[in-house]
A protein has these predicted regions:
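Metallocofactor- and cofactor-centric catalytic cores in central/energy metabolism, strongly enriched
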Residues: 1-259
Length: 259
């Protein structure tokens, strides 16, 4: 293959990736509506809980329905964080926040948790013995010795074993003062503020846009993007996606004209 052939193949790969993401976006928004900006508490609340991780919004919805009225709090984890922006999911009052950071921190964050965890997709690390009896898998993800939740013939799943164990474990004993971060800035949310953004650019209030994206790594000291975002000028807008966001999404960067 020539260099030109490789460039054409690369461009075609990109086109296919964009189309796949469009189909995924259409599937999510047709069921749960377009994401909109929403604050998410990243600290814990007293009471029994289930943490759900991964990318499968349908699994989250089924869990939310099955835990209504049980007193169980639901926390997202990892790439489930953006679900808080969808109207069809954030309407459940017991979807109360997000627990932990990126995938590589799960072993220390899940250590001796007084609650249950459900992994819906990839990024499951070898569970430690301290929580192996309270972590569940579903879909294509799994680990030897980890309990697996299968899909029934009607497409539904029965999370009652997880619910029972979460109630038995009792959960967190006390609240921690809330700390909120922002999610929900999908393309529809950005476009709905297009005129304000254009006006801010024309006035000079916004001079830079940074999209800081990508998957994170587990090696200690990989804090380049944390330091980068800290040093972005005050006339900047920073957008982020993928698990690299956990390097800096808890930073308070302020607002520009309400944006």
């Amino acid at each position: 293959l020539t260099v030109e052939d490789l460039i054409r193949l690369t461009m075609r790969t990109g086109e296919m990736a964009v189309e796949i993401i469009k189909q995924l976006d259409d599937a999510n928004t047709s069921v749960y509506d377009n994401p909109s900006p929403h604050t998410v508490n990243v600290n814990i609340k007293k009471g029994p809980f289930i943490i759900i991780s991964g990318h499968d919004l349908k699994d989250l919805e089924m869990l939310l329905k099955q835990t209504e009225g049980t007193g169980i709090n639901i926390y997202t984890h990892g790439e489930m964080l953006p679900s808080h922006g969808y109207a069809g999911l954030k309407k459940y009052p017991h979807l109360i926040g997000n627990f932990g950071g990126a995938w590589q921190d799960q072993q220390k964050e899940f250590d001796n948790l007084p609650g249950c965890i459900i992994m819906t997709t990839n990024c499951l690390m070898r569970p430690r013995d301290s929580y192996k009896d309270r972590i569940y898998s579903t879909n294509v993800v799994g680990w030897e010795g980890v309990k697996h939740i299968e899909k029934k013939s009607d497409g539904e799943k029965d999370f009652s074993p997880v619910i029972r164990q979460a109630l038995e474990l009792g959960g967190f004993k006390e609240d921690i003062e809330p700390h909120n971060i922002l999610v929900g800035f999908g393309h529809e949310a950005v476009l709905s503020n297009a005129q304000s953004i254009v006006d801010a650019v024309k006035s000079g209030a916004i001079r830079h846009f940074f999209l800081v994206a990508g998957c994170d790594g587990a090696k200690p000291g990989r804090n380049y993007y944390t330091e980068f975002v800290k040093q972005t000028p005050s006339d900047s807008i920073v957008l982020t996606l993928a698990c690299g966001k956990f390097r800096f999404n808890d930073l308070d960067l302020g607002e520009i004209g309400g944006l």
